[in-house]
């Protein structure tokens, strides 16, 4: 089985450097690290020139799209398993990839194959209190394997998955034609919904952990919530009949 890690990057900082170092220490080392870098001027070519298996593809800010850019990265990948990450998500330990693969090997309650397995997000040391509570709410320590049948009890959270750190089976990804293009947000949840509609399951794997949190200003949080609402409105086939109040309203990527 082959594994690629695919990372959209924009103005990478020390967290990205730490992410790459932790990928090199994994018990299951990725075959390739595919970087989709927005704006070549921000890329430190000398700093990452000698990373085994790393390849970098540059695009402009105007070309970036949450779904489309990840689809292009998937097209470059030839692996059995693709792990999408963001450039500020740092593996907590050396077992991240190993545990995500175990998550993909699980089955749903009726024997459904798992198409998607996403990791637990832990707050960084400088994370504010409200963000810590949100992380604990959305990423508990209890594993889950979700299917379409859970919509009646879980509402919108049935489809929750996060490309901050998320593993996909390449054969199913191709069968479902990947992510939606030209989406402002939520390409991961829209894909999870499509996978469940096709009879697959989505696994939450708390043993797979990344450090990832934000200290957003009120205005930044407003824009984030606005983008979330727009993406839901643009895809009524997924979100129209789902409850988004209560626990769902607190979703944070």
What would you call each of these model-derived segments?
Residues 12-25:
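Short, well-formed alpha-helical segments that are part of the catalytic scaffolds
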Residues 82:
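Short aromatic/hydrophobic "clamp" motif used to bind/position activated sugar donors
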Residues 148-168, 184:
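A recurrent flexible, glycine/aromatic-enriched loop bordering the glycosyltransferase active site
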Residues 95-132:
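Conserved donor NDP-sugar-binding/catalytic core segment of glycosyltransferases
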Residues 30-40, 57-59:
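Short beta-strand/loop segment that forms part of the nucleotide-sugar
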């Amino acid at each position: 089985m082959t594994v690629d890690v695919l990372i959209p990057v924009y103005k990478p900082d020390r967290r990205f450097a730490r992410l790459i170092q932790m990928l090199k220490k994994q018990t299951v080392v990725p075959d390739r690290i595919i970087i989709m870098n927005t704006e070549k001027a921000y890329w430190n070519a000398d700093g990452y020139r000698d990373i085994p298996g790393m390849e970098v593809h540059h695009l402009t800010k105007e070309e970036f799209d949450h779904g489309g850019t990840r689809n292009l990265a998937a097209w470059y990948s030839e692996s059995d398993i693709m792990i999408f990450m963001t450039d500020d998500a740092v593996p907590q330990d050396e077992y991240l990839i190993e545990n995500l693969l175990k998550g993909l090997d699980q089955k749903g309650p009726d024997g459904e194959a798992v198409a998607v397995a996403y990791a637990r997000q832990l707050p960084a040391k400088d994370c504010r209190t409200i963000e810590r509570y949100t992380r604990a709410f959305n990423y508990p320590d209890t594993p889950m394997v979700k299917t379409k049948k859970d919509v009646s009890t879980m509402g919108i959270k049935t489809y929750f998955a996060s490309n901050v750190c998320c593993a996909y089976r390449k054969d199913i990804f191709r069968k479902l034609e990947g992510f939606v293009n030209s989406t402002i947000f939520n390409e991961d949840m829209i894909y999870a919904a499509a996978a469940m509609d096709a009879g697959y399951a989505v696994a939450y794997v708390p043993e797979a952990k990344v450090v990832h949190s934000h200290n957003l200003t009120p205005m930044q949080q407003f824009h984030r919530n606005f983008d979330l609402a727009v993406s839901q409105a643009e895809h009524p086939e997924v979100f129209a009949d789902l409850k988004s109040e209560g626990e769902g309203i607190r979703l944070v990527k």
